[in-house]
UniProtKB/Swiss-Prot annotation:
ATP binds at residues 165-167, 219-223, 310-315. GO terms for molecular function: actin binding; ATP binding; structural constituent of cytoskeleton. InterPro entries: Actin, Actin/actin-like_CS, ATPase_NBD. The keyword Kinase does not apply. It comes from Drosophila melanogaster (Fruit fly). SUPFAM superfamilies: Actin-like ATPase domain. This is Actin-related protein 2. Functions as ATP-binding component of the Arp2/3 complex which is involved in regulation of actin polymerization and together with an activating nucleation-promoting factor (NPF) mediates the formation of branched actin networks. Seems to contact the pointed end of the daughter actin filament. The keyword Transport does not apply. It is found in: Cytoplasm, Cytoskeleton. One of its GO terms (cellular component) is Arp2/3 protein complex.
Length: 399
């Protein structure tokens, strides 16, 4: 709470999950899928052994509840690539977040810190503020850039954040607390695309996943089994010539499937976007290009503080593969293959264990530090007087 007794909450609305809680806390109070489910015509009368009539299915279900009953629901995701695509559904998610089932707060007596990816469309930000003040009537609000929050959580003020969540990956250099928007790179490949690609690879093996609920099933399987190959050619030989990589996985309906080379082939799309028909460089080359585009004086500082953040950086093998590829690019393009000079090149990739929640943790730190600084927050009164011009306050603070 701030000095006037108002609640201060942080809400990190990701494409895949909502992470929300109070300022100053070490982890989110609630984490739940950012999904809305509507019942299909229920031709199926049983799920497993449970009679459907025993289950209470509302007209509309959100978050955990929608996830648990997903085989009965048509599931939709209000956000795509970090941008809200369906505002009505997004409001259902927020109703659920602020309502009795989760945060259970009175918005009129609450300050809220929201997050957004760098390079997000202004329209998205404007609509978000409008909804917060007009629909919910929050006392004050602030919108922070996710990459900067990640660095706060890591206790740094300069570095490069590679943030890969469910909907978008971005590489954002930050120098002395300022995000450098002209150097920020965005890659529209993230967790959801890798899940889609895994579904496609499994289809080629003869396993069909075509119901909207299966998407969630494959996502959970991906998190258990996928990894990033250090040496792709070697991994491919292992997959073709041996059964070392094969793992059995039991689906919720009891079927057992065998997964082999798909375990590293699916997340490989992060490094080779052409695998899923996306043009452009992969995550390692993008990080290298970003740092090389920065001022020569700050490059060493950036190479030494590459911080991973977001659920899609949790694959085993990702940090070592990133380091290897960036070193290789530096050797070829900067040192012109002079291997003796490579010893002087310092690179460090930080992979904090709690990186799934890094953005929230940084937000909780920022909200706690600024909770009594009225000049920091956009108040409802300012919004009523100035309308969307109030957003200019953000620019003054963050740049």
């Amino acid at each position: 709470m701030d000095s006037k007794g108002r609640n201060v909450i942080v809400c990190d609305n990701g494409t895949g999950f909502v992470k929300c809680g109070y300022a100053g806390s070490n982890f989110p109070t609630h984490i739940f899928p950012s999904m809305v489910g509507r019942p299909m015509i229920r031709a199926v009368n049983k799920i497993g052994d449970i009679e459907v009539k025993d289950l209470h299915v509302d007209d509309l279900m959100v978050g955990d509840e929608a996830s648990q009953l997903r085989s009965l629901l048509e599931v939709s995701y209000p956000m795509e690539n970090g941008v809200v695509r369906n505002w009505d559904d997004m409001c259902h998610v927020w109703d659920y977040t602020f309502g009795p089932k989760k945060m259970d707060i009175d918005p009129t007596n609450t300050k809220i810190l929201l997050t957004e990816p760098p390079m997000n469309p202004t329209k998205n930000r404007e609509k978000m503020i409008e909804v917060m003040f007009e629909k919910y009537g929050f006392d004050s609000a602030y919108i922070a850039i996710q990459a900067v929050l990640t660095l706060y959580a890591q206790g740094l003020i300069s570095g490069v954040v590679i943030d890969s969540g469910d909907g978008v990956t971005h590489i954002c250099p930050v120098y002395e607390e300022f995000a450098l928007p002209h150097l920020t790179r965005r890659l529209d490949i993230a967790g959801r695309d890798i899940t889609r690609y895994l579904i496609k690879l499994l289809l080629l093996r003869g396993y069909a996943f075509n119901h909207s609920a299966d998407f969630e099933t494959v996502r959970i399987m991906k998190e258990k089994l996928c990894y990033i190959g250090y040496d792709i050619e070697m991994e491919q030989r292992l997959a073709l010539e041996t059964t070392v990589l094969v793992e059995s996985y039991t689906l919720p309906d009891g079927r057992v499937i065998k997964v082999g080379g798909e375990r590293f082939e699916a997340p490989e799309a992060l490094f080779q976007p052409h695998l899923i028909n996306v043009e452009g460089p992969g995550i390692a080359e993008l990080a290298f290009n970003t740092i090389q585009a920065a001022d020569i004086d700050i490059r060493p500082e950036l190479y030494k503080h590459i911080v991973l953040s977001g659920g899609s950086t949790m694959y085993p093998g990702l940090p070592s593969r990133l380091e290897r590829e960036i070193k290789q690019l530096y050797l070829e393009r900067v040192l012109k293959n002079d291997t003796e000079k490579l010893a002087k090149f310092k690179i460090r990739i930080e992979d904090p264990p709690r990186r799934k929640d890094m953005v929230f943790i940084g937000g909780a730190v920022l909200a706690e530090v600024t909770k009594d600084r009225d000049g920091f927050w956009m108040s409802k009164q300012e919004y009523q007087e100035q309308g969307l011009k109030v957003l200019q306050k953000l620019q003054k603070i963050s740049h």
